[in-house]
């Protein structure tokens, strides 16, 4: 259950990172944060990759690790305002919502699912 929650949270976090320009989201990012779930929380480290899949949309894939395991998620995000993205991610049978906000060379990601939430800070 922690694995599914962690993956969902990570994917959502990645999806909600805003960028000044859509093209700047493309590429590899890495960082850390906290995954919260019923009964506790874990520190998490992630590597996230964004690739363009349309005029404005980006595919998202992430590989994250906690003390209890490694998790992978995939999804898609689209612009939802200035330096903001929104999308859905999936992993370990769980789907989550992601909001990404960009401030310079840093992405702030929030992920939420029925199993928990996550907050991440990513950089290039």
Predicted segment positions?
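C-terminal segment of classical bacterial N-terminal signal peptides
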Residues: 12-20
């Amino acid at each position: 259950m922690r694995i599914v929650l962690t993956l969902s949270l990570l994917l959502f976090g990645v999806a909600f990172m805003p960028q000044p320009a859509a093209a700047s989201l493309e590429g590899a990012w890495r960082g850390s944060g906290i995954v919260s779930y019923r009964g506790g929380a874990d520190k998490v480290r992630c590597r996230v990759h964004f690739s363009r899949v349309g005029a404005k949309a980006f595919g998202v894939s992430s590989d994250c690790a906690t003390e209890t395991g490694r998790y992978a998620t995939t999804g898609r995000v689209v612009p939802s305002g200035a330096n903001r993205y929104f999308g859905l991610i999936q992993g370990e049978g769980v789907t989550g919502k992601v909001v990404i906000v960009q401030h310079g060379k840093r992405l702030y990601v929030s992920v939420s699912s029925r199993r928990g939430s996550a907050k991440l800070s990513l950089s290039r």
